[in-house]
From Swiss-Prot:
GO CC annotations, alphabetized: plasma membrane
Lineage: Bacteria, Pseudomonadati, Pseudomonadota, Gammaproteobacteria, Pseudomonadales
Protein's organism: Azotobacter vinelandii (strain DJ / ATCC BAA-1303)
Function: Cell wall formation. Catalyzes the transfer of a GlcNAc subunit on undecaprenyl-pyrophosphoryl-MurNAc-pentapeptide (lipid intermediate I) to form undecaprenyl-pyrophosphoryl-MurNAc-(pentapeptide)GlcNAc (lipid intermediate II).
Highest rank taxon of the organism: Bacteria
GO biological process terms held by the UniProt record: carbohydrate metabolic process; cell division; cell wall organization; lipid glycosylation; peptidoglycan biosynthetic process; regulation of cell shape
Enzyme Commission number(s) from the entry: 2.4.1.227
Key words of the record: Cell cycle, Cell division, Cell inner membrane, Cell membrane, Cell shape, Cell wall biogenesis/degradation, Glycosyltransferase, Membrane, Peptidoglycan synthesis, Transferase
TM annotation in the entry: none
Catalytic activity: di-trans,octa-cis-undecaprenyl diphospho-N-acetyl-alpha-D-muramoyl-L-alanyl-D-glutamyl-meso-2,6-diaminopimeloyl-D-alanyl-D-alanine + UDP-N-acetyl-alpha-D-glucosamine = di-trans,octa-cis-undecaprenyl diphospho-[N-acetyl-alpha-D-glucosaminyl-(1->4)]-N-acetyl-alpha-D-muramoyl-L-alanyl-D-glutamyl-meso-2,6-diaminopimeloyl-D-alanyl-D-alanine + UDP + H(+)
Protein's name in the database: UDP-N-acetylglucosamine--N-acetylmuramyl-(pentapeptide) pyrophosphoryl-undecaprenol N-acetylglucosamine transferase
GO molecular function: UDP-N-acetyl-D-glucosamine:N-acetylmuramoyl-L-alanyl-D-glutamyl-meso-2,6-diaminopimelyl-D-alanyl-D-alanine-diphosphoundecaprenol 4-beta-N-acetylglucosaminlytransferase activity; undecaprenyldiphospho-muramoylpentapeptide beta-N-acetylglucosaminyltransferase activity
Amino acid sequence: MGANVLIMAGGTGGHVFPALACAREFQARGYAVHWLGTPRGIENDLVPSAGLPLHRIQIGGLRGKGLATLLKAPFQLIRSLFQARRIMNELRPVCVLGMGGFVTGPGGVAAKLTGAPLVIHEQNAVAGTSNRALAPLADRICEAFPDTFKPTGKRRTTGNPVRSELFLDSSRQIPDGRRLRLLVLGGSLGAEPLNKLLPAALALIPVEQRPELFHQAGRQHHESTADRYREAGVEAEVVPFIEDMARVYAWADLVVCRAGALTVSELAAAGLPALLVPLPHAIDDHQTRNADYLAREGAAFLLPQATTTAADLAARLSEVSMHPEQLEGMAARARRLAKPDATRTVVDICLEVARG
């Protein structure tokens, strides 16, 4: 294996999955990929499973924390910076790629202190705290959505790295006489407001007009969600988690889901229209900004959680069921927003910086 590359990403799948796509691309080009994370994030499951060496530093989030945590913050930051710097000196990476999460703050500073080229990638339409802080230090800034960062010669709009199997070329035509196929996604933990809203909304639609329903409700909530559908007299397949996203994306005609950056990018890749219900308490309301990107282009409808009732959702579902051509147009517009070359582009930028 060739020279070392260090990827920094942690905390949630929204950071880790795009980073894994980049890791595979680096490996395909002959580079040895190392990973910088924390002891608590999802990277502790996913990165070793991918066969990648995981290096950990002690760092956590500060926003919204209590006074005691804030008082300890300077010491934690200094400790994590020394830990990250030691790892940089051991690995001597030709490039460091920051994909978000708490780990990227001290990791990015350590990269600059040790002279390693630094590239950052922001998955959301609103930049996270670490990436905002690192932007002046970074050699290149990659953004998934246009104009997330201020215009600069370092900025490139790349899209989000998405697994290649999710890019679906087939058209989204709904055959006459077939019921609408509705996919509901709540993420691995589930979105309990959606788990409550969907059964209530579907119960308001006449039985003969109801869509076929596949609902991913989260590991903790799938049984209670299935009970709600049964009590409402609505037929639905409810699962805790979906392993094969490509299969369910190919099956679906319409998706109801949150608006995390990775989800929005996957919808575009799969060419799927969506009803997006952004998480209302997301930091900087970034999910609303993510959703607005698809909604402005006519690829999705944005439904605020605070004002969307079961009756509102039932009416929207009934409308699109009766006008499948509307969904077909939304699907085509979603597909036009896809960035199939995002992974390759991000890695190209990293190696361009590495070569100086």
